[in-house]
From Swiss-Prot:
<dbReference type="InterPro" id="IPR009080">
    <property type="entry name" value="tRNAsynth_Ia_anticodon-bd"/>
</dbReference>
<feature type="short sequence motif" description="'HIGH' region">
    <location>
        <begin position="127"/>
        <end position="137"/>
    </location>
</feature>
<comment type="similarity">
    <text>Belongs to the class-I aminoacyl-tRNA synthetase family.</text>
</comment>
<keyword id="KW-0648">Protein biosynthesis</keyword>
<dbReference type="InterPro" id="IPR035684">
    <property type="entry name" value="ArgRS_core"/>
</dbReference>
<dbReference type="InterPro" id="IPR008909">
    <property type="entry name" value="DALR_anticod-bd"/>
</dbReference>
<dbReference type="Pfam" id="PF00750">
    <property type="entry name" value="tRNA-synt_1d"/>
</dbReference>
<dbReference type="GO" id="GO:0005737">
    <property type="term" value="C:cytoplasm"/>
</dbReference>
<dbReference type="Pfam" id="PF03485">
    <property type="entry name" value="Arg_tRNA_synt_N"/>
</dbReference>
<keyword id="KW-0963">Cytoplasm</keyword>
<dbReference type="InterPro" id="IPR014729">
    <property type="entry name" value="Rossmann-like_a/b/a_fold"/>
</dbReference>
<protein>
    <recommendedName>
        <fullName>Arginine--tRNA ligase</fullName>
        <ecNumber>6.1.1.19</ecNumber>
    </recommendedName>
</protein>
<keyword id="KW-0067">ATP-binding</keyword>
<dbReference type="InterPro" id="IPR036695">
    <property type="entry name" value="Arg-tRNA-synth_N_sf"/>
</dbReference>
<dbReference type="GO" id="GO:0005524">
    <property type="term" value="F:ATP binding"/>
</dbReference>
<keyword id="KW-0030">Aminoacyl-tRNA synthetase</keyword>
<dbReference type="InterPro" id="IPR001278">
    <property type="entry name" value="Arg-tRNA-ligase"/>
</dbReference>
Length: 622
C-alpha cells in the first residue's frame, strides 16, 4: 500500500477502535469520508472531523479529540505529532520519513496503480453512423476512454464497447438518399463520414419537405434549410432534387427500416456497406486521437438473432405489455419508493410507459437496448455496465433500468450506470444537425494543430516539431473535455484550451518537458545518497506527490476524471514555483542535489501517469 494510504488507513483504524471502546460502531469507510488534508500545514498533514461522534457521545468536540490524541500517540509509524484542534484530530508526518517512502514510490513506472478486482463494461462514443463525429461525441469519447484507463489503473478488468445504431431512422434516411443519388461510395479523396454526412443532411431535408404530413410553416422552414445546404453543397442538392420523385418519401424510409429489420438480403447488404464506410471515417478519427474500442456491437445483430423478440415475449409472459393503437407498450407496475431509491430515480419524476414495438412491427431503440444491456452484462460477466450517454437521454436510460427490473434482471438494473454529460459550446459557432452545421472533431483537431504550430514553430526544442504539434493539439482538446465535471456544460475557448501558462494540457505537458529537461542536465537521482533530512522545506510538494494514488483511486470510485485534472494542475503550479526558486542540477551539496532530483523525477513521473489516465501524451521536449 502507498505511504499516505497506509498511514491514513492505520490512523482511521485506531480512531474506529477508540470510538468502539466508547460504544460507537463506526465503519472505516465512514471516517474516510470525513478525512482530508487540513487547510494549513501548522494544523498537520492529515485530519479527521469528529464533531458528529462527540455529539453522539455527549462530549464537547475538543474533549473527545483530546482523549483520542492520548490514546493514539506513539502508535503510528512516521508520525511526528498528533494534534487535537477543536473537533479535528490531525497528524503531522515526519518529513524525512515521508520523503524517503513517497519519492521511492513515485519513481516507479506504474505509480498510482491499484489492485481492485472487478469486471466493468464502458460503452462510449456510439455515434449514429450518418455523419462525422462532432464536439458532443468528442466529450463522450474522451470521457469514456479516460474512464476505461482510470478503471484499469484501479485494477479492474475493463471492456470498452461501441454500439452501432444501424436500425434507426437516420441510417434509413441516409440509405434512401444514396439510392436516389444512385451511388453508395464516397468520391475519391473525401473522408467517408464527411461525405455521408452531407448526403444525410440533404436527404433528411428533402424527406421532411416532401412529407404529406408537414404543414405550410414547417415546409417553409425546410425550404430555408435546403437553400442553406444548396449554398454549401450545390451538386449533391441539385442531383438529389432531380431524382426525388416519391409522393411520400417518409413511407419509403419506413419501408427501408422495416425491410432491414426483417433481414431482407438486398437491403441488408446496402445498409451494412454504407454503415461500414461511415465507421471507417470514425475509426480514422479515433486512431488520430489514440482511442481504441474493444468491441463493436451491431444493433441489427441483436434483432436478427432473436434476442429482442425474446425480451418482448418475456414482457408479455409477465403481463407487462398492453396494446395501444396497434403498438406494444410496456407498463411499469412496480415503481414504488424502494425501487426509485435502488434505481436512482428521482421522487416525483413521472415515467411514461415504454413503447416496445410500433404498429408497423418495427422495434424501438430502447427495446433493443434492453437486449443489448443483458448482452453486455452476460458476455463479459460484468459487475457493472457504464453507459456514457448525453444527459438529455436521462428518461430513456431510466426506462431502460426500470424495464430490466420489471423483467427480473434486478441486479443488472441496479448496476447499470448512466454516465451523463452536458453539452459543449464553441463561442461564435452554432451546431444544427438539420442544417448540416456541425463542429466536427476533425475540424477541431485541425484547428488546434494550426494554432499550436503558430505558437511553437521556431521556438520548439524538439527534433520532430510535427509530432509535438500533434501531441499538444490532441492533448489540449482531450483535456478540455475531461477536466470539467461531466454534469457541467463546457464553453470551449481557444485562449484557455491552448494556454501554455496555466490550467490546460499544454501547461501540464510543458511542465513535464521542463522536469525531464532538468533530469537530462542533472542526471538520474541516486535515492540512496539523497539527504532526506533536508526534506522539510519541500514537504508540501512531497505531500502532493504522495496524494496521487489516493486521487487516482477516488477518480475510479467516483467515476470523475476531472479530479485527476484538478490535482495535476495544482501539482504543476507547486513544481513551477519550486523550479523558479531552487537550483537543481547546479546544487553543490550532493545529498541535497539528489533529493531535489528525486523530487523532480517524482513530479515528472506523476504528471506523465496522470496525463496518461486522461488519454494525454507527454512529450519529453516541447
Amino acid at each position: 500500500m502507498y505511504v499516505l494510504s497506509e498511514t491514513k488507513s492505520n490512523f482511521l483504524k485506531l480512531i474506529a477502535e477508540a470510538l468502539k471502546r466508547r460504544g460507537l460502531e463506526v465503519e472505516e469507510e465512514e471516517l474516510e469520508r470525513l478525512a482530508g488534508r487540513p487547510p494549513s500545514p501548522e494544523m498537520g498533514d492529515l485530519g479527521v472531523s469528529l464533531f458528529r461522534y462527540a455529539k453522539k457521545l455527549g462530549l464537547r468536540p475538543e474533549e473527545l479529540t483530546s482523549e483520542l490524541k492520548g490514546e493514539i500517540e506513539g502508535r503510528l509509524a512516521g508520525v511526528k505529532e498528533v494534534k487535537a484542534i477543536g473537533g479535528f484530530l490531525n497528524v503531522e508526518l515526519e518529513p524525512s520519513w515521508l520523503a524517503e517512502r513517497a519519492l521511492r514510490e513515485a519513481s516507479r513506472e506504474d505509480y498510482g496503480k491499484w489492485s481492485f478486482s472487478g469486471r466493468l463494461v464502458v460503452e462510449h462514443t456510439s455515434a449514429n453512423p450518418v455523419h462525422p463525429l462532432h464536439v458532443g461525441h468528442a466529450r463522450n469519447m474522451f470521457l469514456g476512454d479516460s474512464l476505461v484507463r482510470i478503471l484499469k489503473n484501479w485494477g479492474a478488468d475493463v471492456q470498452s464497447r461501441f454500439y452501432i445504431n444501424d436500425m434507426g431512422r437516420q441510417v434509413a434516411v441516409l440509405v434512401y438518399g444514396l439510392l436516389k443519388l444512385g451511388r453508395l461510395e464516397p468520391p475519391e479523396g473525401e473522408k467517408p463520414d464527411h461525405w455521408y454526412g452531407k448526403v444525410y443532411s440533404v436527404a433528411n431535408a428533402l424527406v421532411e419537405l416532401n412529407s404529406p404530413s408537414k404543414g405550410d410553416d414547417e415546409k417553409k422552414e425546410w425550404e430555408e434549410v435546403l437553400k442553406e445546404l444548396e449554398s454549401k453543397w450545390p451538386e449533391i442538392v441539385r442531383e438529389m432534387k432531380e431524382k426525388f420523385d416519391d409522393e411520400d418519401p417518409e413511407a419509403k424510409v419506413s419501408e427501408l427500416m422495416k425491410k432491414y429489420e426483417e433481414g431482407d438480403p438486398e437491403v441488408k447488404e446496402t445498409f451494412r456497406k454504407v454503415v461500414n464506410e461511415v465507421l471507417k471515417g470514425f475509426k480514422e478519427t479515433m486512431e488520430r486521437v489514440g482511442v481504441n474500442v474493444d468491441k463493436w456491437d451491431w444493433e441489427s445483430d441483436l434483432v436478427w438473432s432473436g434476442e429482442v423478440d425474446k425480451i418482448i415475449n418475456m414482457a408479455k409472459e409477465k403481463g407487462l405489455v398492453i396494446e395501444k393503437d396497434g403498438a406494444l407498450v410496456m407498463v411499469f407496475k412496480n415503481l414504488n419508493d424502494e425501487v426509485r431509491r435502488r434505481l436512482r430515480i428521482p421522487k416525483g419524476l413521472q415515467i411514461p410507459p415504454l413503447v416496445l414495438k410500433r404498429s408497423d412491427g418495427t422495434t424501438l431503440y430502447t427495446t433493443r437496448d434492453i437486449a443489448y444491456t443483458i448482452k453486455k452484462f452476460e458476455e463479459f460477466r460484468a459487475d457493472r455496465v457504464i453507459n456514457v450517454i448525453a444527459a438529455e437521454q436521462r428518461l430513456p436510460q431510466i426506462q431502460l433500468r426500470l424495464a430490466l427490473w420489471e423483467l427480473g434482471f434486478k441486479e443488472y438494473a441496479e448496476n447499470l450506470i448512466h454516465y451523463a454529460y452536458e453539452m459543449v459550446n464553441v463561442p461564435g459557432m452554432k451546431m444544427s444537425g438539420r442544417r448540416g452545421r456541425m463542429i466536427t472533431l476533425d475540424w477541431l483537431l485541425d484547428e488546434a494543430e494550426r494554432r499550436v504550430r503558430e505558437l511553437v514553430e521556431g521556438r520548439s526544442e524538439a527534433e520532430d516539431v510535427d509530432e509535438v504539434v500533434k501531441k499538444v493539439a490532441v492533448g489540449a482538446v482531450k483535456f478540455a473535455m475531461v477536466s470539467v465535471s461531466p454534469e457541467k456544460p463546457i464553453t470551449f475557448k481557444w485562449e484557455e484550451v491552448l494556454n501554455f501558462e496555466r490550467n490546460s494540457a499544454p501547461y501540464l505537458q510543458y511542465t513535464y518537458a521542463r522536469a525531464v529537461g532538468i533530469l537530462r542536465k542533472g542526471g538520474e537521482p541516486d535515492l540512496e545518497r539523497a539527504d532526506y533530512s533536508k526534506a522539510e522545506k519541500y514537504k508540501d510538494m512531497i505531500l502532493s506527490i504522495a496524494e496521487f494514488p489516493e486521487v487516482a483511486r477516488k477518480a475510479a470510485e467516483d467515476l470523475k476524471p476531472d479530479l485527476i485534472a484538478t490535482y495535476l494542475l495544482s501539482l504543476a503550479d507547486k513544481f513551477n514555483e519550486f523550479y523558479h526558486k531552487e537550483p537543481v542540477a547546479k546544487e553543490p551539496d550532493e545529498g541535497l542535489r539528489n533529493l531535489k532530483l528525486a523530487l523532480v523525477k517524482a513530479v515528472a513521473n506523476t504528471i506523465r501517469r496522470g496525463l496518461w489516465l486522461l488519454g494525454v501524451e507527454a512529450p519529453a521536449r516541447m
